[in-house]
C-alpha cells in the first residue's frame, strides 16, 4: 500500500510541474491577421481590408483583499506600427478616396493608455459596415455589397508622413 501511495505521490508531483509552467496556456500578445471593414462618408462602398492588430493574453493579477486598491492591469498594446493606405472606389467628387490604416508590426503587454487605445472589453457591435444592405436570409445569393475573399484589398504600403 505504501508503494502505491508513493507512486501516486510521484505521479502527482511530476505532472504538477506542467500546471505551474511559465508557458502560456492561451495565445500570447502578438500581431494577428484579421479582416476589418473600411468605409468613409462620401464613399458608397464598404471594403473588407486585410490587416494586423494586436491581440492575445497578458498576465494579470487580482488582489485578494478587497480593501487594497486594485493593481494596474496590462493589456495587449501596439508597440510598433506602420500605416498603409486603402483606396475606396466610387467616392463622390471632392472626397479623398484614400484611407490610412494602422497595421501592427509588433505588440507588447503594457498599461492601457486611453489617449490612443480602447481599454474596454469587446462590445456587441459588428465590425462590419454601417451602410450594409440587408437581404432575405433565406436567399442563396450573397448581398451585392459583400466582396469575395479573392477581391479583398491588400494594403498598399504607404508611409504616413507627419505634417
UniProtKB/Swiss-Prot annotation:
<dbReference type="InterPro" id="IPR029034">
    <property type="entry name" value="Cystine-knot_cytokine"/>
</dbReference>
<keyword id="KW-1015">Disulfide bond</keyword>
<feature type="disulfide bond">
    <location>
        <begin position="58"/>
        <end position="109"/>
    </location>
</feature>
<dbReference type="InterPro" id="IPR018245">
    <property type="entry name" value="Gonadotropin_bsu_CS"/>
</dbReference>
<dbReference type="InterPro" id="IPR001545">
    <property type="entry name" value="Gonadotropin_bsu"/>
</dbReference>
<keyword id="KW-0964">Secreted</keyword>
<feature type="glycosylation site" description="N-linked (GlcNAc...) asparagine">
    <location>
        <position position="145"/>
    </location>
</feature>
<feature type="disulfide bond">
    <location>
        <begin position="43"/>
        <end position="91"/>
    </location>
</feature>
<comment type="similarity">
    <text>Belongs to the glycoprotein hormones subunit beta family.</text>
</comment>
<dbReference type="GO" id="GO:0005615">
    <property type="term" value="C:extracellular space"/>
</dbReference>
<dbReference type="GO" id="GO:0007186">
    <property type="term" value="P:G protein-coupled receptor signaling pathway"/>
</dbReference>
<dbReference type="InterPro" id="IPR006208">
    <property type="entry name" value="Glyco_hormone_CN"/>
</dbReference>
<feature type="disulfide bond">
    <location>
        <begin position="54"/>
        <end position="107"/>
    </location>
</feature>
<feature type="disulfide bond">
    <location>
        <begin position="46"/>
        <end position="129"/>
    </location>
</feature>
<dbReference type="GO" id="GO:0005179">
    <property type="term" value="F:hormone activity"/>
</dbReference>
<keyword id="KW-0372">Hormone</keyword>
<feature type="region of interest" description="Disordered">
    <location>
        <begin position="135"/>
        <end position="163"/>
    </location>
</feature>
<feature type="glycosylation site" description="O-linked (GalNAc...) serine">
    <location>
        <position position="150"/>
    </location>
</feature>
<feature type="signal peptide">
    <location>
        <begin position="1"/>
        <end position="20"/>
    </location>
</feature>
<feature type="disulfide bond">
    <location>
        <begin position="29"/>
        <end position="76"/>
    </location>
</feature>
<feature type="disulfide bond">
    <location>
        <begin position="112"/>
        <end position="119"/>
    </location>
</feature>
<protein>
    <recommendedName>
        <fullName>Choriogonadotropin subunit beta</fullName>
    </recommendedName>
</protein>
<comment type="function">
    <text>Stimulates the ovaries to synthesize the steroids that are essential for the maintenance of pregnancy.</text>
</comment>
<feature type="glycosylation site" description="N-linked (GlcNAc...) asparagine">
    <location>
        <position position="50"/>
    </location>
</feature>
<keyword id="KW-0732">Signal</keyword>
<dbReference type="GO" id="GO:0005737">
    <property type="term" value="C:cytoplasm"/>
</dbReference>
<feature type="glycosylation site" description="O-linked (GalNAc...) serine">
    <location>
        <position position="139"/>
    </location>
</feature>
<comment type="subunit">
    <text>Heterodimer of a common alpha chain and a unique beta chain which confers biological specificity to thyrotropin, lutropin, follitropin and gonadotropin.</text>
</comment>
<dbReference type="Pfam" id="PF00007">
    <property type="entry name" value="Cys_knot"/>
</dbReference>
<feature type="compositionally biased region" description="Polar residues">
    <location>
        <begin position="135"/>
        <end position="151"/>
    </location>
</feature>
<feature type="glycosylation site" description="N-linked (GlcNAc...) asparagine">
    <location>
        <position position="124"/>
    </location>
</feature>
<keyword id="KW-0325">Glycoprotein</keyword>
